[in-house]
């Protein structure tokens, strides 16, 4: 059995987990998340702790018990604390502005780039060169951060572009005569 799958997931106060045959629902202060339950994994809620057991001894069932445990742990963490990604804009004239559910970027193109945020995701710009993407669903927050970064990834010679705040960009040396 997967070592990750053997660990129990503690459900904190204020988080409600309901398990049907094919759907796991996690409700908390930051929203509700749904995930289909895998057919090879049995999920049980025992006194505020979730356990994940494979239904047979196949390698797929063992692997999926660990995967389901990690995904549900992220759901529980997301609806109680939430997830966030911080992006930095590096470059002359590069600016970001949050307008409700839209992110307006001026990143060196002839036109502003506008990114619409889905429901359940909050975007903030503490300064003109910082973007904070917050939400309960870890996968959606990470995917949106990657999509925003893809508009202008950091280039290797000067480091200009959009990067994660903790990302280190390796700067190349220019060609010498």
Curated annotation (Swiss-Prot):
The protein's assembly and partners: Part of the 50S ribosomal subunit.
Pfam families: Ribosomal_L6
Protein function: This protein binds to the 23S rRNA, and is important in its secondary structure. It is located near the subunit interface in the base of the L7/L12 stalk, and near the tRNA binding site of the peptidyltransferase center.
UniProt key word rRNA-binding: yes
SUPFAM superfamilies reported in the protein's UniProt record: Ribosomal protein L6
One annotated Gene Ontology cellular component of this protein: cytosolic large ribosomal subunit
Keyword Ligase: no
Protein name: Large ribosomal subunit protein uL6
Stored PROSITE patterns: RIBOSOMAL_L6_1 (PS00525)
NCBIfam families to which the protein is assigned, alphabetical: L6_bact
């Amino acid at each position: 059995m997967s070592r990750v799958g053997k660990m129990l997931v503690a459900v904190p106060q204020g988080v409600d987990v309901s398990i049907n045959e094919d759907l796991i629902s996690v409700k908390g202060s930051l929203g509700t998340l749904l995930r289909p339950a895998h057919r090879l994994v049995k999920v049980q809620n025992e006194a505020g702790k979730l356990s994940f057991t494979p239904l047979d001894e196949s390698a797929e069932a063992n692997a999926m018990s660990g995967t389901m445990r990690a995904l549900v742990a992220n759901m529980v963490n997301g609806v109680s604390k939430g997830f966030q990604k911080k992006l930095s804009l590096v470059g002359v004239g590069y600016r970001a502005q949050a307008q409700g559910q839209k992110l307006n970027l001026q990143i060196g193109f002839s036109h502003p780039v506008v990114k619409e945020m889905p429901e359940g995701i909050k975007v903030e710009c503490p300064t003109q060169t910082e973007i904070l993407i917050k939400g309960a669903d870890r996968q959606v927050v990470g995917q949106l951060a990657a999509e925003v970064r893809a508009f202008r990834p950091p280039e290797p010679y000067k480091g200009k572009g959009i990067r994660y705040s903790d990302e280190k960009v390796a700067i190349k040396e220019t060609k010498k005569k």
